[in-house]
Curated annotation (Swiss-Prot):
Residue numbers covered by the propeptide annotation in the UniProt entry: 1-10, 19-33
Signal peptide: none
Name under which the protein is recorded: MSDIN-like toxin proprotein 2
Keyword terms of this UniProt record: Toxin
Annotated function: Probable toxin that belongs to the MSDIN-like toxin family responsible for a large number of food poisoning cases and deaths.
Chain positions of cross-link Cyclopeptide (Ile-Pro): I11-P18
Species whose genome carries this gene: Amanita phalloides
GO MF: toxin activity
Length: 33
């Protein structure tokens, strides 16, 4: 079971992480401006 979770987590997080990075970057840039 742990092996299955280890292989699934990167697949699930792959599309989510870029979205979070975009949000953080947008907030940082707007705050600096």
């Amino acid at each position: 079971m742990s092996d299955i979770n280890a292989t699934r987590l990167p697949i699930i997080l792959a599309p989510i992480i870029p979205c979070i990075n975009d949000d953080v970057n947008s907030t940082l840039t707007s705050g600096e401006r």
